Curated annotation (Swiss-Prot):
Substrates-to-products reaction catalysed: dCTP + H2O + H(+) = dUTP + NH4(+)
Lineage: Archaea, Methanobacteriati, Methanobacteriota, Thermococci, Thermococcales
A Pfam match: DCD
GO molecular function, one term: dCTP deaminase activity
Protein name: dCTP deaminase
Record's keyword terms, sorted: Hydrolase, Nucleotide metabolism, Nucleotide-binding
The keyword Ligase is annotated on this UniProt entry: no
Disulfide bonds: none
Amino acid sequence: MLLPDWKIRKEILIEPFSEESLQPAGYDLRVGREAFVSGKLIDVEKEGKVVIPPREYALILTLERVKLPDDVMGDMKIRSSLAREGILGSFAWVDPGWDGNLTLMLYNASNEPVELKYGERFVQIVFIRLEDPPRNPYSGNYQGSTRLVFSKRKKL
């Protein structure tokens, strides 16, 4: 079952919370302070924006910390306005028990650069209640992330 807006406000810890980002059945996550594009770490908060060149990918940190109860998971989709500009997103499930900022991958499939401003809404997360809590909520490598995190599989 997807959580409606009033249950999201009541049951999901989102910091900093924005009323503008709360949707009827989800929450729009915003561009955070760090990004990784073209082999470079970008201070998005300082620069005010991040630009994703054509046919390149970017890792973007969310502004929000999201803390999920043990019986709720998250699923994310790119906002349709960005999809219409050629941005694709590849996102993992947000496991029950997750706590931290999220590092998300976007790909610019267009022939034009796409600019994202610091604090801009770019991905919607919906929250799904499980029938029962898992025996082992998430406690993996990325738990507690507050900075952009690269893959633990490979060193950059």
